[in-house]
Amino acid sequence: MDPVDPKLEPWNHPGSQPQTACNNCYCKKCCYHCQMCFLKKGLGISYGRKKRSQRHRTPASLQDHQNSISKQPLSRTHGDPTGPKEQKKEVASKTETDP
């Protein structure tokens, strides 16, 4: 083993840099090309910027449809609030007249 100059940084030591440039191939040989290729291709770890996912905007025709629905009055599915009171009064009046 050849002695290494102590003044050189570790990334400049002979043999620390691969002789060929990195490429986009994912074969076994290229995955083990260098540490960066191994992390990126072999393990699937990349530290680059993540792409923002675009929110899908609704077309104008659908927005108009939603606006028209919200302007309509809400229908009451629970029944008329005056209904049960009147029924109780009717039941009470029937029981009073029957005896």
Curated annotation (Swiss-Prot):
Region feature (Interaction with the host capping enzyme RNGTT): 49-86
Record motif Nuclear localization signal, RNA-binding (TAR), and protein transduction, residues: 49-57
UniProt domain comment: The cell attachment site mediates the interaction with ITGAV/ITGB3 and ITGA5/ITGB1 integrins, leading to vascular cell migration and invasion. This interaction also provides endothelial cells with the adhesion signal they require to grow in response to mitogens.
Main subcellular localisation: host cell
Protein name: Protein Tat
InterPro entries from the UniProt entry: IV_Tat (IPR001831), Tat_dom_sf (IPR036963)
HAMAP family noted in UniProt: HIV_TAT (MF_04079)
Residues covered by region (Interaction with human CREBBP): 1-24
Location of cross-link Glycyl lysine isopeptide (Lys-Gly) (interchain with G-Cter in ubiquitin): K71
Biased composition (Basic residues): 48-58
Biased composition (Basic and acidic residues): 77-99
Lineage, broadest ranks: Viruses, Riboviria, Pararnavirae, Artverviricota, Revtraviricetes
Region feature (Cysteine-rich): 22-37
Annotated positions of the Asymmetric dimethylarginine modification: R52
Hydrolase in keyword set: no
Function: Transcriptional activator that increases RNA Pol II processivity, thereby increasing the level of full-length viral transcripts. Recognizes a hairpin structure at the 5'-LTR of the nascent viral mRNAs referred to as the transactivation responsive RNA element (TAR) and recruits the cyclin T1-CDK9 complex (P-TEFb complex) that will in turn hyperphosphorylate the RNA polymerase II to allow efficient elongation. The CDK9 component of P-TEFb and other Tat-activated kinases hyperphosphorylate the C-terminus of RNA Pol II that becomes stabilized and much more processive.
Self-association and partners: Interacts with host CCNT1. Associates with the P-TEFb complex composed at least of Tat, P-TEFb (CDK9 and CCNT1), TAR RNA, RNA Pol II. Recruits the HATs CREBBP, TAF1/TFIID, EP300, PCAF and GCN5L2. Interacts with host KAT5/Tip60; this interaction targets the latter to degradation. Interacts with the host deacetylase SIRT1. Interacts with host capping enzyme RNGTT; this interaction stimulates RNGTT. Binds to host KDR, and to the host integrins ITGAV/ITGB3 and ITGA5/ITGB1. Interacts with host KPNB1/importin beta-1 without previous binding to KPNA1/importin alpha-1. Interacts with EIF2AK2.
GO biological process: DNA-templated transcription; positive regulation of transcription elongation by RNA polymerase II; positive regulation of viral transcription; symbiont-mediated perturbation of host chromatin organization; symbiont-mediated suppression of host innate immune response; symbiont-mediated suppression of host translation initiation; symbiont-mediated suppression of host type I interferon-mediated signaling pathway
GO molecular function, one term: trans-activation response element binding
Residues binding Zn(2+) 2, per UniProt: C25, C27, C30
Binding-site list for Zn(2+) 1: C22, H33, C34, C37
Post-translational modification summary for this protein: Asymmetrical arginine methylation by host PRMT6 seems to diminish the transactivation capacity of Tat and affects the interaction with host CCNT1. Acetylation by EP300, CREBBP, GCN5L2/GCN5 and PCAF regulates the transactivation activity of Tat. EP300-mediated acetylation of Lys-50 promotes dissociation of Tat from the TAR RNA through the competitive binding to PCAF's bromodomain. In addition, the non-acetylated Tat's N-terminus can also interact with PCAF. PCAF-mediated acetylation of Lys-28 enhances Tat's binding to CCNT1. Lys-50 is deacetylated by SIRT1.
Keyword Transcription regulation: yes
Pfam hit, one: Tat
